[in-house]
Each structure stands twice: as structure tokens, then as C-alpha cells.
Amino acid sequence: MSVIPQETDEALSPEAIEAARKIFAGPIAFLKSAPSLKFLPDMEAPEVAFAGRSNVGKSSLLNALTGRNSLARTSNTPGRTQELNFFDVGEDPVLFRLVDMPGYGFAKAPKDVVLRWRFLINDFLRGRTVLKRTLVLVDARHGIKDVDRDVMKMLDEAAVSYRIVLTKADKIKPTELEQTLAATIAEARTRPAAYPDVIAISSDTGQGIAELRALVIEAVS
């Protein structure tokens, strides 16, 4: 778990962005999948987790951040990722880990699958002392939904700091994006564990990717 967020002015300096680029250009490898807590890797390195509704673009974002085309599998099937997937960044030593959390909000999932997801995520958030930040991905075309609020409530209650990231920012008009950003920032500022700033990104165009890399590095530093 992590402390309540505080802003760092230097996080998005040109120097920080370049340093983050170099780290993400280095060795990155899939470590393991964990369908339950007993399969979690040892807590040997700080972690940043990625959460979001099914098909919000988590896998595409992970690939864009790391500059790989197939680090994380992308799928047109909502809810495909039903495990916690861990990726090592750096080697000898591992600098930190990225955690791809199971997508949520899949409408046709059986109730037992939904309950299993909730127990897995809740226990992971509350017991993972090396988890430094969670990035909650929200589709810019739709804004924050109730299922997102459920996850943010879990993060608030677990005292895990998180930042909201608007994905697919290139899919809507700039004026619509501004409105969605304003509404999202306003809601983030009502949440005890959320950063008050929101970043909009596009995995397709690269918008915001360099800045998000720097924010990830800030979280684990």
C-alpha cells in the first residue's frame, strides 16, 4: 500500500521524461500470471498497477509505454484478462514491476467470475506493500462509470494512491476531451487517494505516453 498522494513538480521536466524514456527502452520481460494470491511473485521490487474496464485499452497502453508490439496481449474479447500479469522492468537488478490487473465491467460474465475478481483485487490491493501507484484507465469517450467508481472506492479504502488516465483521447473532438478532462478532474478531487491531476493519452498517436512514463518512474522512485 502507499500513502495519500502528493504532487511532485519535477515529475514532468524534460530531464525526467528523457530518463523515463531510457528506462522503458531497456529490458522489460513478462514475469508471471497470478490467478490467485498464492501465485503472486515475491515483493522484491516496487510495483505500478493498471486497472480499467474491459477493452479500455490497458494492453495497448502497456505496449505503447514499453515500445513493444506484443508485451501485453490485446484482444477484442471483453474480460479476456482474468489474472494479474506481472512484468519486470530492468534486470540485475529489477527496477520495478508493471501489473496488468484483470479488466472489469464485463456485462456477460458469470456472477462467480465477478466475485472472484472482486476478492482477488481487494486482497491484492490491501496486502501488497510494494504497490506504489495504480493507474485507473477511463475511456475518454465515455468518462467515469459506476464500475470505475467501485474500483476507486476500493483504492480509497485500501489507501492505495491512484491517478486517473483518460485513454483513447484521439477518438473524440478536442472540445469534448476538454469537457471530459474537467469533469474527471473535478471528481478526482473528491477522492481521498486520487491524484487531483488527470492525464489524457492515446496509444495510437502517442499523445501523453512520454509524460505517463515519467509519472510511473516518479511513483516508484
What residue spans do the PLM features occupy?
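Switch II of P-loop NTPase G domains
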Residues: L40-A45, R80-F86, P102-K132, A140-M154
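Hydrophobic packing within well-folded, soluble alpha/beta domains
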Residues: L61, T134-L135, L212
